[in-house]
């Protein structure tokens, strides 16, 4: 067994990888500028974690794994190179695991985390002891990653950033949607779509490529008519055997909102008999039509792998979400505060719609922390439509991640642009200021959405704390 040192171990992706390495019997250490719940969980498993970075931390390691967020010189990576310690990436490990065992890869611009979690939960509920590697904590699964039975599939949330998903040769893959993102890696929408086409071409059995028919970006991925399609309602596709229009392979119909969440009927199309058959009624505890699609994909994958579909559906009913995915932080004085990872305009729009579905008749107030200068600029014209349904939108300073720029200037420019298109928008400022300004804007009965992929969840925690303070002083 080997000793892996992970630089940037507090991140969702790297902390999940650490759990898989531990499950395989390896020794893991790590460092990061901050600690969090993820590092606390790893420390409880015996992982030595340093806060900060120092060249001495890599001594004794057999390999150093570094997050993609690191650019340029880094003291630990420089020391590792001087000591002859190999530097690995996520892609290196994914390539190795993909060769060791079957991988079910879940790709797409939006919905990867939830669909990955639902797929793993459906498989396990249906009798398949799969492993999983997900970029968020999933309470229903007991964490973000487990190795599981090495002869069973490993469900991987296949991130397209840095083209890392191209390291996989999946036994099965789901593509939820394809919509241009990560302009720092993919300069044009054509570049982005080409990467997904390359990913889809690497699926070993084309009949195990599941594509969402509701998304126009996936259409080009079915190059030979063998892919399986899923979607909502009575959409049709061309059956490659009969050369006639036929129902989708997996269809969600009669979607209804319930007090607990939503329900729908799942149907499948038998390409051998040309018959459309009822599979089961599915109950979900999470809101949003996008989650109906996610659940349909997960159940289709479980069925194709041979899981018990009825048991898989029952397992999905226990899914209450993942960390930072429509995560209810609390309710104080009639105000519900929800944190979500949404940072692309399409995700922001879907999350607002989910809040309106879950909390009908209540005002939805939204805080958005734009994520990276390149994404904010590249998707500029999408923001008004994404935010239009909110009662009030507060725009925080841009989270730069690995990029350089003026976070205040771009945020205030975005506010002016939204206002020009009729959106009730305000400038929120930095984290602490944004929380204060949100508390001043909200009223009893409001639903507050805190959206972003950076440290925006701190705003949610601060809003809860300030509301509790106001309530105590009343």
UniProtKB/Swiss-Prot annotation:
Keywords: ATP-binding, Cell cycle, Cell division, Cell shape, Cell wall biogenesis/degradation, Cytoplasm, Ligase, Nucleotide-binding, Peptidoglycan synthesis. GO terms for molecular function: ATP binding; UDP-N-acetylmuramate-L-alanine ligase activity. ATP binds at residues 108-114. Its EC number is 6.3.2.8. Cell wall formation. Pathway: Cell wall biogenesis; peptidoglycan biosynthesis. InterPro entries: Mur-like_cat_sf, Mur_ligase_C, Mur_ligase_C_dom_sf, Mur_ligase_cen, Mur_ligase_N, MurCDEF_pg_biosynth, UDP-N-AcMur_Ala_ligase_MurC. GO terms for biological process: cell division; cell wall organization; peptidoglycan biosynthetic process; regulation of cell shape. Belongs to the MurCDEF family. It comes from the Bacteria. This is UDP-N-acetylmuramate--L-alanine ligase. It catalyses: UDP-N-acetyl-alpha-D-muramate + L-alanine + ATP = UDP-N-acetyl-alpha-D-muramoyl-L-alanine + ADP + phosphate + H(+). It is found in: Cytoplasm. Pfam families: Mur_ligase (PF01225), Mur_ligase_C (PF02875), Mur_ligase_M (PF08245). GO terms for cellular component: cytoplasm. It comes from Chloroflexus aggregans (strain MD-66 / DSM 9485).
């Amino acid at each position: 067994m080997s000793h892996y040192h992970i630089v940037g171990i507090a991140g969702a992706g790297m902390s999940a990888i650490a759990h898989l390495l531990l499950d395989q019997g390896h020794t893991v250490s790590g460092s990061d500028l901050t600690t969090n719940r993820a590092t606390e969980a790893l420390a409880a498993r015996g992982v030595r974690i340093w806060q900060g970075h120092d060249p001495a931390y890599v001594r004794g390691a057999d390999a150093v794994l570094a997050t993609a967020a690191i650019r340029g010189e880094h003291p630990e990576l420089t020391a590792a190179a001087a000591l002859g310690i190999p530097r690995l990436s996520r892609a290196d490990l994914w390539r190795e695991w993909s060769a060791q065992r079957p991988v079910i890869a879940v790709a797409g611009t939006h919905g990867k985390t939830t669909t990955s979690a639902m797929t793993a939960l459906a498989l396990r509920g249906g009798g398949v002891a799969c492993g999983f590697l997900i970029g968020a904590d999933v309470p229903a699964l007991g964490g973000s990653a487990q190795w599981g039975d090495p002869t069973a599939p490993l469900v991987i949330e296949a991130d397209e950033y840095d083209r890392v998903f191209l390291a996989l040769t999946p036994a099965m893959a789901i593509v939820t949607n394809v919509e241009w993102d990560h302009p720092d890696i993919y300069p044009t929408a054509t570049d982005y779509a080409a990467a997904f086409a390359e990913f889809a071409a690497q699926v070993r059995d084309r009949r195990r490529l599941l594509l969402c028919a509701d998304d126009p970006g996936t259409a080009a991925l079915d190059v030979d008519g063998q892919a399986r399609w899923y979607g909502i309602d009575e959409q049709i596709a061309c059956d490659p055997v009969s050369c006639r229009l036929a129902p989708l392979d997996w269809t969600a119909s009669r979607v209804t909102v319930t007090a607990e969440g939503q329900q729908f009927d799942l149907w499948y199309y038998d390409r051998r008999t040309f018959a459309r058959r009822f599979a089961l009624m599915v109950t979900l505890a999470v809101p949003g039509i996008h989650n109906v699609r996610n659940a349909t994909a997960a159940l289709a994958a479980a069925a194709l792998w041979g899981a018990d579909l009825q048991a898989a559906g029952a397992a999905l009913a226990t899914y209450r979400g993942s960390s930072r995915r429509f995560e209810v932080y609390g309710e104080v004085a009639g105000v519900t505060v929800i944190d979500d990872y949404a940072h692309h305009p399409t995700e922001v729009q879907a999350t607002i719609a989910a809040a309106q579905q879950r909390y009908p008749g209540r005002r939805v107030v939204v805080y958005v922390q734009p994520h990276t200068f390149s994404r904010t600029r590249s998707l500029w014209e999408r923001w008004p439509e994404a935010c239009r349904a909110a009662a009030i939108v507060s725009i925080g300073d841009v989270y730069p991640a690995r990029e350089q720029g003026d976070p205040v200037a771009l945020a205030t420019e975005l506010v002016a642009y939204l206002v020009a298109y009729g959106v009730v928008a305000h400038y929120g400022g930095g984290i602490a200021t944004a929380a204060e300004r949100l508390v001043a804007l909200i009223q009893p009965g409001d639903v507050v959405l805190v959206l972003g992929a950076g440290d925006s969840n701190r705003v949610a925690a601060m809003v809860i704390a300030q509301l509790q303070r106001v309530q105590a002083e009343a």
